[in-house]
Amino acid sequence: MAEDLDKPLLDPDTFNRKGIDLGILPLEEVFEYLRTSPQGLLSGDAEERLKIFGPNRLEEKQENRFVKFLGFMWNPLSWVMEAAALMAIALANSQSLGPDWEDFTGIVCLLLINATISFFEENNAGNAAAALMARLALKTRVLRDGQWQEQDASILVPGDIISIKLGDIIPADARLLEGDPLKIDQSVLTGESLPVTKKKGEQVFSGSTCKQGEIEAVVIATGSTTFFGKTARLVDSTDVTGHFQQVLTSIGNFCICSIAVGMVLEIIIMFPVQHRSYRIGINNLLVLLIGGIPIAMPTVLSVTLAIGSHRLSQQGAITKRMTAIEEMAGMDVLCCDKTGTLTLNSLTVDKNLIEVFVDYMDKDTILLLAGRASRLENQDAIDAAIVSMLADPREARANIREIHFLPFNPVDKRTAITYIDSDGKWYRATKGAPEQVLNLCQQKNEIAQRVYAIIDRFAEKGLRSLAVAYQEIPEKSNNSPGGPWRFCGLLPLFDPPRHDSGETILRALSLGVCVKMITGDQLAIAKETGRRLGMGTNMYPSSSLLGHNNDEHEAIPVDELIEMADGFAGVFPEHKYEIVKILQEMKHVVGMTGDGVNDAPALKKADIGIAVADATDAARSSADIVLTDPGLSVIISAVLTSRAIFQRMRNYTVYAVSITIRIVLGFTLLALIWEYDFPPFMVLIIAILNDGTIMTISKDRVRPSPTPESWKLNQIFATGIVIGTYLALVTVLFYWIIVSTTFFEKHFHVKSIANNSEQVSSAMYLQVSIISQALIFVTRSRGWSFFERPGTLLIFAFILAQLAATLIAVYANISFAKITGIGWRWAGVIWLYSLIFYIPLDVIKFVFHYALSGEAWNLVLDRKTAFTYKKDYGKDDGSPNVTISQRSRSAEELRGSRSRASWIAEQTRRRAEIARLLEVHSVSRHLESVIKLKQIDQRMIRAAHTV
């Protein structure tokens, strides 16, 4: 076959030139044109075809790296700095002084430094993201060398034979072969929400999703030659402005408006009133522009998100949408599946509890029938549990010939096999949901009451039920409906809770995240699982969501019922969507876990869609975050890390707003009251050193909030105004003491510099530099900044920057910047002054936060730190233990100081504690009864365990 590969028909463009449409030709001709067979390709042939057709992925537009670099200097904040640069060489060119090339060069350097850091960090983040997304690459089962293999979909070529099953995203355009009809969701291509039925010979398109069925297909087009690829080339990508970008824009606009107000005041007073010279006035305006613009903000925040995304991936949570980190930090409700998330999804069958419904069968026969109705390959948890109960897994197909296998689908909720036994008789066996199997059976009315009674008895013990039935097929045809179905038995399935689920749920509740169990199992099973996990038993059937329940809770509004419930049972995918929708309407930030194709709508609707480990391709494509490790603890760890990331971003925004207000107000007052002119070049030095230091905040050591986070812009602006005003007044006071008093000369024996404007500028430079950079230690902490150790990198950067600033102030003699060194004694005085006025910043922070939220003093006293590393679970010190004092607060206190969501979480946590106490009490009573029955001396036991 390899020697035929050079024939022109395999050229991707040949089919178009010759008018050959592989989508409508008979299958025999398709195989002939593609020179393949139902046995698939050989690896060598596939490799040669891959060279001809290229990888099975859409062509990515290569962006010019230089244009991309320039793009980092094209945003509103950069525009202001670029305007300042133009002012330095154009407007400042007067009075025979010439353009201000020094300031122009400094501004350009500042822009280039920020653009360079942004460029390289985004490249690194992009490479890291590409590596992470490679782990989520679409997989497919392909028939190569006569064997089925799981491979990346990118290696598919025309002529490959692939397997398509429930939940798969179709990896390439293909024609269906022998097998059951498929239900295909083509909404991504056509916009049509209803799935369409596809049978043998029909074409399926890349990007659509298999909703039901299982079948083989031959690939006829890959990559950009697929229907999806051709469509994508006609559509220009559009950038959607997300919430995070809106936040950045709002903060940037606030800073720009603050600077504009200061500039207008200076222009109005300096020129008409004070009659200042033109060049000096321009220099004062440059000080506000250069010092007030948080030019590093886009870089700092994007780098923080990128580093946080990498940290999450190390914890088993891959972020597909970067801003999902911000939303996860604010999540206050988590709707999670029971199976696989709260439990191990490692099912076991208790053979002793199997119920047999036909006289001529025993428990082993029931197990054998269930095994025959199970897959031996690509097993789900139920198939694996059933087959493992057989003495030898091969027994499931021993002495029979399989004719047809019906895989599980969410509609029928059962699997079935048609087979011929050793006597040549035809049978069909099925296993699945008891309700579905019972509806098939002829004796339904006679046995229904007994079946439901057994199901309820199993459910009270936390056991799921699996029904088994069979029928004879006298017509000996796979298409025959067969004879009457016989209900054979019920198998109990036990899915044990994860060992850490109970503790993790309590931790989530204490963090203000309500965990709601969403399960398709019975209500009794859900309540029993909730009791075992200690998450409460306030659960309802799915019918209550539609107002169909007639119990004592029917008077409760649906939205309130959903908000207060611990979980829901018997849930279908449409119920999940409705739960998310109602919670969002009640202003909750909702996370939803899912693994199946039918979970996709709810995952898309949720603020944070979370695809659990081993989720289907459809669920992964709809989710914002994909878990690589099972269990709830991964999600809670991701919540803590997201809050830490959010805290870093919030800390920086408060810092940036404070510095803007401080520069604008402080230097405007100095220019208008004392007619003091600070050199613009020195503001540039401050900005460069500040930006270099503040970049390290992306790796700072922070304390995640004990409650869900959100962008409270009004609070950020108000905090920035208060702190910035204080710092501005401190700087103004410092200037006044230097030029109008002899305080420093008398008490510290330094020489007077009041009449030396260049030395005054050096002193002002050092004071502004110290207090500006030290402010980050205040904004980064929720308690006393002296007692919360920053990250090592931040400390190191601060020391280096301030060492440079101090050396400049002490020794510099820069004529064009008009500064002269002030010596070490003055530097020591300035450091002492800055330290004295640094201390009240914490007090101002507490008082202001207390005025806004009433929580500040609790934060002062409560210094427990929540960890962000999964490896730290279970440690006593430095672990994510939530503050004990928060657990003991009353509901009234919570109503007054937190959101309603946190209050609900507290109520849920209390119900969970009650459920746990009941569990402990029941175990205790059981132990006492055993001790009495065995006539064991309890005093000996107590003595042996007494310290």
UniProtKB/Swiss-Prot annotation:
**Tissue specificity, please?**
Found primarily in developing seeds. Expressed in guard cells, mesophyll cells, leaves and roots.
What InterPro entries does the record point to? ATPase_P-typ_cation-transptr_N (IPR004014), ATPase_P-typ_cyto_dom_N (IPR023299), ATPase_P-typ_P_site (IPR018303), ATPase_P-typ_TM_dom_sf (IPR023298), ATPase_P-typ_transduc_dom_A_sf (IPR008250), HAD-like_sf (IPR036412), HAD_sf (IPR023214), P-type_ATPase_IIIA (IPR006534)
Enzyme class, broadest EC rank: translocase
Q: Where are the transmembrane segments?
A: 70-89, 102-122, 252-272, 282-299, 651-672, 678-700, 717-737, 759-779, 792-812, 821-841
Q: Which UniProt keywords apply?
A: ATP-binding, Hydrogen ion transport, Ion transport, Magnesium, Membrane, Metal-binding, Nucleotide-binding, Phosphoprotein, Translocase, Transmembrane, Transmembrane helix, Transport
Catalytic activity reads: ATP + H2O + H(+)(in) = ADP + phosphate + 2 H(+)(out)
Pfam families annotated for this entry? Cation_ATPase_N, E1-E2_ATPase, Hydrolase
Superkingdom, natural source: Eukaryota
Localization, UniProt: Membrane
Q: Tell me the residue ranges located in the Cytoplasmic compartment per UniProt.
A: 1-69, 123-251, 300-650, 701-716, 780-791, 842-947
Decide whether keyword RNA-binding is in the record.
no
* Active-site residues, record numbering mapped to chain: 337
Q: Which residues carry this modification: Phosphoserine?
A: 897, 929
Gene3D superfamilies on file: 6.10.140.890, Calcium-transporting ATPase, cytoplasmic domain N, Calcium-transporting ATPase, cytoplasmic transduction domain A, Calcium-transporting ATPase, transmembrane domain, HAD superfamily/HAD-like
What this chain does, per the entry, is described as: The plasma membrane H(+) ATPase of plants and fungi generates a proton gradient that drives the active transport of nutrients by H(+)-symport. The resulting external acidification and/or internal alkinization may mediate growth responses.
- Similarity-based family: Belongs to the cation transport ATPase (P-type) (TC 3.A.3) family. Type IIIA subfamily.
Protein name from the UniProt record: ATPase 10, plasma membrane-type
Q: What is the protein's species of origin? A: Arabidopsis thaliana
